[in-house]
């Protein structure tokens, strides 16, 4: 990273980004969240908005992983720098889900529970899992009755033998 200002070739920038991403992920997996954020921030600094077109997956990964490292290291003031452009440039709702999860987790960690719920409800609705504006005991009872009715002729063994969920929208909503 120290000689990065001397790099002229885009392929070398890509390689340097990949190395910083790898170092950031290793640091994160070792619970060294501050170091992870440093590496991922460095990778972020080597990119620009053109990367959303030319290196979309890498750019999205940098934004998502850096946002998560900022959250895990409690550097909440840095979240917007990664999340806002990530949400703006992500090509699909499924590409945005991990960013929304990090944002909601950070809100909860900061005691902003109502904001987290308000932010996630429209996302869940777009994923096909709408929630009422104000869930009451009645809503919960109705949903439990629906569930019991749907499972009325199903044994635990049958449930255990069901195939794994494969619908990306339902997986993302969980």
Range-by-range predicted roles:
Residues 101, 111-170:
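Alpha-helical repeat/alpha-solenoid scaffolds of the HEAT/ARM/MIF4G superfamily
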């Amino acid at each position: 990273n120290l000689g990065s200002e001397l790099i002229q070739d885009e392929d070398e920038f890509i390689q340097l980004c990949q190395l910083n991403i790898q170092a950031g992920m290793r640091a994160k997996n070792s619970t060294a969240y501050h170091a992870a954020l440093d590496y991922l921030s460095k990778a972020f600094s080597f990119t620009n908005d053109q990367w959303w077109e030319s290196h979309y997956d890498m750019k999205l990964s940098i934004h998502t992983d850096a946002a998560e490292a900022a959250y895990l290291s409690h550097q909440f003031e840095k979240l917007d720098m990664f999340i806002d452009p990530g949400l703006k440039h992500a090509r699909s709702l499924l590409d945005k889900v991990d960013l929304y999860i990090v944002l909601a987790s950070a809100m909860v960690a900061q005691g902003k529970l109502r904001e987290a719920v308000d932010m996630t409800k429209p996302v869940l609705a777009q994923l096909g899992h709408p929630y009422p504006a104000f869930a009451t005991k009645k809503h919960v009872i109705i949903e439990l009755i629906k569930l019991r009715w749907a499972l009325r002729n199903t044994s635990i063994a049958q449930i255990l033998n069901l195939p794994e969920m494969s619908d990306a929208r339902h997986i993302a909503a969980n």
